[in-house]
Amino acid sequence: MIDPRGNVQGSYDKVHLFNAVVNGTTFRASDVESAGDHLVIADINGVKVGLSICFDIRFPEMFRQMARAGAQVILVPAAFTRTTGKAHWEVLVRARAIENQAYVVASATIASEDATVSGFETWGHAMVAGPWGMCWQIWARSITASGLLSWIWPRWTRCERSCLCFIPVDLRFTSVSPGTFRVIACGLQGLDVKALR
């Protein structure tokens, strides 16, 4: 994570490695990567920003931990396959935003250009989802760039040919703001699970 002045504020190693079979194709990230062992929240100009990577989005408890630690914005750079992206991408991004009362900024690599290198086509469809379920989507499927970058900026909404987008973010709607719909504060922790027979 690099702040607006170019200073490194922190780094994150993906905790959940993608070991799966999708449409007959086997992915074993653990063969070439090592999993991280902690979560990261950086303070960027007074905004608490949580870091995650791709497959991490499928683990809601990770996002809840960051929200409980004060994350207002959570970044998710990703390369979902076309199959999993079409079925799950938007649902997961919006769910993590709503259930944790945070903005989720989900950049995504685009389509066929990656297929020649990685052997699979990626879904693309970068988006920003807000705490009330609002969603700004960038439906890029034919751009020849290898990725799409989403940035948040407090006052402007503008998407230009350069694929740089500015999305309005109102941090008053996040879980750490007084007077908001306080789902995080109302949640129960440490309940025992009772098995029924």
Give the ranges of each region predicted by the language model:
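A short linear-motif detector with a strong N-terminal bias
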Residues: 18-22, 29-32, 83-84, 105-107, ...
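C-terminal beta-strand edge segments of enzyme domains
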Residues: 109-195
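CN hydrolase (nitrilase-like) catalytic-core segments centered on the catalytic cysteine
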Residues: 48, 57-147
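Conserved hydrophobic/aromatic beta-strand scaffold that supports enzyme active sites
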Residues: 1, 11, 39-41, 106, ...
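Glycine-rich loops and low-complexity Gly/Arg-rich segments
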Residues: 7-10, 25-26, 34-38, 67, ...
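Active-site catalytic loop in hydrolytic enzyme cores
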Residues: 1-69, 82-91, 95, 162
